[in-house]
Amino acid sequence: SQIIIAYEPVWAISTTIGHKDATPKDSEEMIIFIRKVLADKFGAKAQLPRIIYGGSVNEKDALEFIRDGGAEGLLVGRASLNAKKFIQIIKKCETLNN
């Protein structure tokens, strides 16, 4: 319960040549895969770690990665360098707790 796994597809990193934005569906599929691998190795305890997503999220799509993509949090990169955008991400994600 104290372990957090960050998933960031290399092809979704904005500085990567051939960069391609990931979708919440991409995230969901990989999070399911990660959970299956963990379950094979560790059994029922595999459901305990939180899995967060970190592939070029922004204020427009961050909420979708949590709501539809299976992520339990975000590892915000470039968007965190702009305070207004970062605050927008936080406020949108807070709506899930209401």
List each language-model region with its residue ranges.
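Glycine-rich phosphate-binding active-site loops on the catalytic face of alpha/beta enzymes
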Residues: T16-I17, S56, G70-I89
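Active-site rim beta-loop-alpha module in soluble metabolic enzymes
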Residues: S1-A46
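C-terminal helical cap(s) of enzyme catalytic domains, especially alpha/beta-barrels
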Residues: P24-S27, S80-N98
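Generic structural signal for well-ordered alpha-helices
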Residues: E28-R35, A62, I87-I90
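Acidic (Asp/Glu)-rich catalytic clusters
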Residues: I66-D68
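A generic secondary-structure signal
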Residues: V37-K41, E64, K92
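Hydrophobic faces of well-ordered beta-strands that scaffold small-molecule active sites
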Residues: I3-P9, Q47-G55, E72-V76
